[in-house]
Amino acid sequence: LVNTSSIFGIITTPNNTVYHASKFAVRGFTESLIKEMEGSNTQIHCVYPGHIGTNIAINAKFGDQIVKGENKDGILGLDGEPIKDLKGEKVSEEEAGVRFRDAGMDPDKAAKIILRGIKKNKKRIFVGIDSKLMELSQRLFPDSYLKIMPITLFLGLLFSPHRLKKVINLAIKKKA
């Protein structure tokens, strides 16, 4: 049995209470089930993916909690200001979703990591260096991990040079 939570079942960010509650519920359910099924032949795993290159940001229906909306100035961030790329150009909601997807780990690679974790009978399967680093920062700094999250994410990119290159290319990519 493989249940998928998220790194957001380990850490929390402001204004995402319902999402975190659902991911923590999957985590709690799975960890409890692992204890209940000890001694049986049933393998139970909980997957904690980090940033995987899926269409979640394109297909998601964002509310005011995540994005304040889109107007003639482009997609607005939490501060109410338009989100811009490294060239200072405004980014649409669709373009932001595409860039988010394209900067993530290849889903096939994520699947291989999950299958390897299942074969090794790992109860917790963290997918991606970002997921592992965020989980570690939460354990080491439970009250202040959000303050160091930018550093954690940057370190994740440094340990994954191909993703760092993708992120830089996407950040400076000119909209066609």
Can you say where each PLM-predicted feature lies in the sequence?
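SDR active-site lid
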Residues: 39-129
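Catalytic tyrosine of NAD(P)H-dependent dehydrogenase/reductases that use a Tyr as the general acid/base
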Residues: 19, 27
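Active-site helix of classical SDR
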Residues: 22
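Residue(s) in the substrate-gating loop at a strand-loop-helix junction
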Residues: 6
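Active-site loop immediately N-terminal to the catalytic Tyr-X3-Lys motif
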Residues: 11-18
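A transmembrane-helix-recognition feature enriched in membrane-embedded lipid enzymes
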Residues: 122-158, 163
